[in-house]
Amino acid sequence: MAKGVNQIINNIRLRKLRKILNQINALSEEFSNFSDEALQAKTKEFKVYLNDNKASLNHILPQAYATVREASKRVLGMYPKDVQILGAIAMHQGNIAEMQTGEGKTLTATMPLYLNALTGKGAYLITTNDYLAKRDFLEMKPLYEWLGLSVSLGFVDIPEYEYAENEKYELYHHDIVYTTNGRLGFDYLIDNLADDIRAKFLPKLNFAIIDEVDSIILDAAQTPLVISGAPRVQSNLFHIVKKFVETLEKDKDFIVNFNKKEVWLTDEGSEKASHYFKVNSIYQQQYFDLVRMIHLSLRAKYLFKYNLDYFIFDGEIVLIDRITGRMLPGTKLQSGLHQAIEALENVEISQDMSVMATITFQNLFKQFDEFSGMTGTGKLGEKEFFDLYSKVVIEIPTHSPIERDDRPDRVFANGDKKNDAILKTVIGIHETQQPVLLITRTAEAAEYFSAELFKRDIPNNLLIAQNVAKEAQMIAEAGQLSAVTVATSMAGRGTDIKLSKEVHDIGGLAVIINEHMDNSRVDRQLRGRSGRQGDPGYSQIFVSLDDDLVKRWSNSNLAENKNLQTMDASKLESSALFKKRVKSIVNKAQRVSEETAMKNREMANEFEKSISVQRDKIYAERNHILEASDFDDFNFEQLARDVFTKDVKNLDLSSERALVNYIYENLSFVFDEDVSNINMQNDEEIIQFLIQQFTQQFNNRLEVAADSYLKLRFIQKSILKAIDSEWIEQVDNLQQLKASVNNRQNGQRNVIFEYHKVALETYEYMSEDIKRKMVRNLCLSILAFDKDGDMVIHFP
């Protein structure tokens, strides 16, 4: 019933898009008769029209799309099909276009990118990795340039490349920019750490199309981008706590909730810890760090798996993205968790760095005036797209009917019998010369199947995170005659597997999946490796009762039935009742997994709200300071009065010594005036005296700065230094606080409410500390000039 209603709604949306499509098609013949010069001149015509008439882009959409369509035919030899036009219209309107593998999403995106770039405000195509961004940029660059638009790759594809001054500015200030979500996110954070308007390089974020949008803003939504700063004081407890954790018994001394990714000590475990570390109670205030370390060690040991969440490369822990199977080099878990895993694996413990800046992909893309996306599996995430981003998903029909045969699951009592059946199936397919792609959940399983196939004289390509450099080549070869490719769920997403004619004739690509993934969208993505653009092929998932999905997310005890474990595998597989029961267990487990993941993303989004609001306010204030041409209207005396009024109230400045010490610390290193004539019982008299000292010291520094530009730079840098030092500390504190409240077992206490309450309190404290730092910087900084005559500021 629900499926039928959804289809009706989708058809209504498509009807609206087809009305616009008909307008574009009506222009096809006219535009095909244009000379190259006339067609190229359209870009300038559109820009002039938009500027002169202040018109919306919708007014010129049919003509703009007809222009790109005809230009694509002439420049690329590709003429966008009607279904691609539908997807392009949907994306310009800010929707998610669900387009199946091989339907030409790269070409589809050129139309809304071109249209939105006509405003002069820029348009981005954002994808998941460098290879895809560079590939799409190189393929589409001739089209944009022929039409008179500038296009760039938003990064230099050289490892450890150091950008020259203004180089990033040049890369980003093009009409159209191709980049990745990770690179754009880090550049956004870096741009907002600039202390000079000339060091900023990002333009205002106008319009973006996100490729594989569900992977980026749903699956990766909980992964924050983090820029690290100075190292924290390193604890020496990691190895000691690791040894203690090894003495604990699961379910007796601690409880693990794998689904919620939580772990905590029981009363017995707490007593054991107190006894082990020879303290009265580990929950005394002075042992807070010890409790934190115990929880970190437990999380490292029980919630993170080698070869699934991380692996060891060159003696270092390298994280793996569970969803894509890709390595995340240079990325570290925060708040000491990375170091706990290093201790667990006996590798050298790295420095735990403080957090300078952070943002999630959810909030990164909310910085755009508008964004849309495309994916092959959007419908399954439609509710979340709407709840989090107010985006609807429009299912775009395929140009050719999907010929792939998605066969029913094959079910087994245990993993050993299932693995034997998978190997027999792959060998059987290989004997027919039909190419096969075997996809596994983990790198460990992929390595096992690859090795077993080699033992049976079946040559194969192994594609896992550790050899991702060969990904594109392996995937390109996966559709060749007799090819066998074993891969994790990364499986070359975004890269088409093209079939030779011989392979097409013998049934296309066979996709064998060794277990259901936690998310039905990922299952669909993996099946979609076969059957592109009406190609033949088939997919099949093999299931056992001890699959990770079933063990983690199902409470069924069917796997413990000894009769099932001893039954002949073929008889069991042919049992309709058994298959029905297992299908029900798997479907329910996957549903629970998806619901839990959605709740976790909602929770992450709730946690992010506080820091998001604070970050937006801080970044807006920084930009206001950077863009200021003078500070003539800024009331510095009122700033000083606010600070001194609070300090006189909260600090004991009622003695001459206390007042002089305060002046040394905040206003002047060389103060030598007599304060004996000040009435120490009169707060206003003390405040007036401090304001007088502030004004004198501030003016002294302005005199050193000499000209108006240097005075401006001194004030800007002093204020920014105050904001940044306190904001960096606030961000780090909020990261630590989030980790702390996640570890607490607070009964009915709402941890989100608690987090927001503390976050607001600390923000208010931070705001006062920023003012105090501003006063100190304006009074205590030392201004000097280097041999080139450039001003150098030494802050207190």
From Swiss-Prot:
Tell me where it resides.
Cell membrane; Cytoplasm
- Broadest EC class assigned to this enzyme: translocase
Q: Which UniProt keywords apply?
A: ATP-binding, Cell membrane, Cytoplasm, Membrane, Nucleotide-binding, Protein transport, Translocase, Translocation, Transport
Would the keyword Iron be found if you checked this record's keyword annotation?
no
Q: Name one GO biological process term.
A: protein targeting
Entry keyword annotation includes Membrane: yes
Q: Which PROSITE patterns match?
A: SECA_MOTOR_DEAD
Principal subcellular localisation of the protein = membrane
In terms of superkingdom, the source organism counts as Bacteria
Membrane topology, from the record: Peripheral membrane protein
Q: Which EC number(s) does the record attach to this protein?
A: 7.4.2.8
Q: Which Pfam families does its entry note?
A: P-loop_SecA (PF21090), SecA_DEAD (PF07517), SecA_PP_bind (PF01043), SecA_SW (PF07516)
Q: Which reaction does it catalyse?
A: ATP + H2O + cellular proteinSide 1 = ADP + phosphate + cellular proteinSide 2
Q: Please tell me where ATP binds in this chain.
A: Q84, G102, E103, G104, K105, T106, D496
- Which protein family is it in? Belongs to the SecA family.
Assembly, per entry: Monomer and homodimer. Part of the essential Sec protein translocation apparatus which comprises SecA, SecYEG and auxiliary proteins SecDF. Other proteins may also be involved.
Q: What is this protein called?
A: Protein translocase subunit SecA 2
What organism is recorded for this protein? Staphylococcus epidermidis (strain ATCC 12228 / FDA PCI 1200)
